[in-house]
Amino acid sequence: MAVSCPEVMYGAYYPYLYGRAGTSRSFYQYERFNQDLYSSSGVNLAASSSASGSSHSPCSPILPPSVSANAAAAVAAAAHNSAAAAVAVAANQASSSGGIGGGGLGGLGGLGGGPASGLLGSNVVPGSSSVGSVGLGMSPVLSGAAGHSLHSSHRTHAHSLAHAHTHPHSHTHTHTHQTKEEDLIVPRSEAEARLVGSQQHQHHNESSCSSGPDSPRHAHSHSHPLHGGGGATGGPSSAGGTGSGGGDGGGTGAIPKNLPALETPMGSGGGGLAGSGQGQAQYLSASCVVFTNYSGDTASQVDEHFSRALNYNNKDSKESSSPMSNRNFPPSFWNSNYVHPIPAPTHHQVSDLYGTATDTGYATDPWVPHAAHYGSYAHAAHAHAAHAHAYHHNMAQYGSLLRLPQQYASHGSRLHHDQQTAHALEYSSYPTMAGLEAQVAQVQESSKDLYWF
């Protein structure tokens, strides 16, 4: 069966898009955020409050079942007016004695600007350790003699929504929470301003909405010892409390109001350039400043430095350098016309040839010593050896007439004396042939004309 309706098809796979009940609830199935619970601008909170004992919004305070919605609204309205006075009394008592004696809340304003009429009224007794009968209007809602003392290491967490927890053992634990909306809307009272100036670190600015353990602003993970008689709340193990030494005891998100200002003196320790008193600032441009920390004649110091460096260099060069005449250069370095002497050969035939050539005065011609000993034809062949070797590839047609040694010897063996002697001795018994010499000269001249231009 083909389904053509896109809402039916996509609704089966994406139930949260079409409001169907699936594994994930739709956004509109949750209760909307009740802004009136957290605003104290004089609106009647009891009429607009939708929080009940069974269903509540994710950000509404969780109250005991014995406190009704109207009572919760009244307590929330009166808590802001009572926060400053209660925290001031608690701070004074905590700084003077070990435990807060009489943690009662007294002298509070009425609901929505009404008369005081004894809302949450009790007297503060500086020596006792009991919380007086906390009443709402004329009917006592929460009462009981409590042996629950607040230790001085907890340093009065100032929150402003009164969470009154009833207990069968009649231990009463009272917190006051102040939310972010009240911090932004309502100005601080004079007592709260005096409290900020005191040495006690008060933790405001914390919202009761972030109640999840993994929320980033969940700073106060309170451990309420309700079952222990006379147990101290807070202490060093409390995440949001301050330790007995005065420092923060591990609070992650709670920021103290009066942090000591970081005062860093500029000239302390002589670390600054301008703070030393000797520096001279010279502004080269708007973004370039030259600090001179030397007091004296700068020009003379620079001259002395460079003169000392130059003298040091000259002294080293005098010790290490030597004149050119003392160095071991070959004689040809000094005389460009110098001819290197011919070393004495070891072969007996070559020694005879060189000796004959030296006597006849042909020392500069390498081919003359051979020709002077061999004969006229050998002399003609060796005298033109360079030209014949250059053009021997074009003289292949005259190979039967010109039996030159260079055509039959390799380039490397051509200069070897033994092979040259063997080739020369081959022609030494031939008579002089004038026509052959003329033909050789004619071929060489024609080769010059062909390739040299």
Curated annotation (Swiss-Prot):
Keyword Nucleotidyltransferase carried by entry: no
Subcellular location field: Nucleus
Region called Ser-rich sd binding domain, residue ranges: 279-335
GO terms under biological process: cell elongation involved in imaginal disc-derived wing morphogenesis; compound eye morphogenesis; determination of muscle attachment site; DNA replication; dorsal/ventral lineage restriction, imaginal disc; haltere development; imaginal disc-derived leg morphogenesis; imaginal disc-derived wing morphogenesis
Record's compositionally biased regions (Basic and acidic residues): 178-193
Biased composition (Gly residues): 227-253, 267-278
The organism's place on the tree of life at top rank: Eukaryota
Tissue expression: Expressed in the developing wing primordia initially along the D/V wing boundary, and by the late third larval instar, maximal expression is seen in cells at the D/V wing disk boundary. Less expression is seen in cells located farther from this boundary.
Stretches for region Disordered: 145-279
GO MF, any single term: DNA binding
Alphabetic keyword roster: Activator, Cell cycle, Developmental protein, DNA replication, DNA-binding, Nucleus, Transcription, Transcription regulation
Listed GO CC annotations: nucleus
Residue spans of biased composition, Basic residues class: 151-177
InterPro entries: TDU_repeat, Vg_fam
Tagged with keyword Nucleus: yes
Role of this protein: Involved in determining which thoracic imaginal disk cells will form wings and halteres, perhaps by interacting with other nuclear regulatory proteins. When in combination with scalloped (sd), it acts as a transcriptional activation complex that regulates gene expression in the wing. Binding to sd switches the DNA target selectivity of sd. Required and sufficient for cell proliferation at the dorsal/ventral (D/V) boundary of the wing imaginal disk. Also required for cell proliferation in the wing imaginal disk, mediated via activation of E2f.
Quaternary assembly: The Ser-rich protein domain within the C-terminal region interacts with the C-terminus of sd to form a complex which acts as a selector for wing development. Interacts with Dhfr.
PANTHER family per the UniProt record, alphabetical: PROTEIN VESTIGIAL (PTHR15950:SF15), TRANSCRIPTION COFACTOR VESTIGIAL-LIKE PROTEIN (PTHR15950)
Extra remark: Loss of vestigial function selectively eliminates wing and haltere formation.
Identification of the protein by name: Protein vestigial
Source organism of this protein record: Drosophila melanogaster
Taxonomy of the source species: Eukaryota, Metazoa, Ecdysozoa, Arthropoda, Hexapoda
